[in-house]
């Protein structure tokens, strides 16, 4: 079984306006869409689309949290999310116009997870994950999430004999690597930040990844339009 863990759930609120978005003007909407946000849940959506069994877990709150679960279930995701009372799943507001110059993105921080919520995730992983399962932690945890709690969740997975995949950044990436994950997937900027030097060519990345081979079984570094490099 594949499990995905979304610690900072989100709803993408996509607003498309007519013409070009203009300051100090009445920009009329052409279309408004609500969609699932959060990296890990997107993994579950992709797996479900390919009819690959998986379970998605995490913490949601309020009407936006309920909407996120409903949208995920409509896409075939087997959801096992827990609700934190008096909190609201964050919105990522995406503004699109017809200029062809890209979008504007305004992202809320998300709510602080309670001790009870963190324990629910831990208990779910402990009770359900089995040897050789795959558990995906993708995205950055919400504000105030203690690095010790993050490592504790990862270690539950490792102690169960499951395969750990981490797609995160900064201190959370560093912590994931102390658990010797099966795979990590930073982007080019996150990877350069981690190794504390700039990389310019494919050979630069290949040589840097050779230095990191003891930290994870597999590395995939996404390079934007240039594709990805894996080791």
Q: Where would I find each of the regions flagged by the language model?
A:
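Glycine-rich phosphate/adenosyl-contacting loop at the front of the ribokinase-like
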Residues: 1-57, 65-67
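Cofactor-binding loop segments of dinucleotide-utilizing enzymes, especially the Rossmann-like FAD-
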Residues: 5-9, 59-62, 84, 98, ...
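Glycine-rich beta-alpha junction loops
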Residues: 9-11, 60-63, 190, 225-226
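Short beta-strand scaffold segments in enzyme catalytic cores
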Residues: 45, 91-95, 227-231
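Conserved N-terminal subdomain of the carbohydrate kinase-like
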Residues: 49-133
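Short beta-strands and strand-loop turn motifs
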Residues: 105-107, 132-140, 167, 185-190
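Conserved phosphate/ATP/ADP-binding segment of small-molecule kinases
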Residues: 148-231
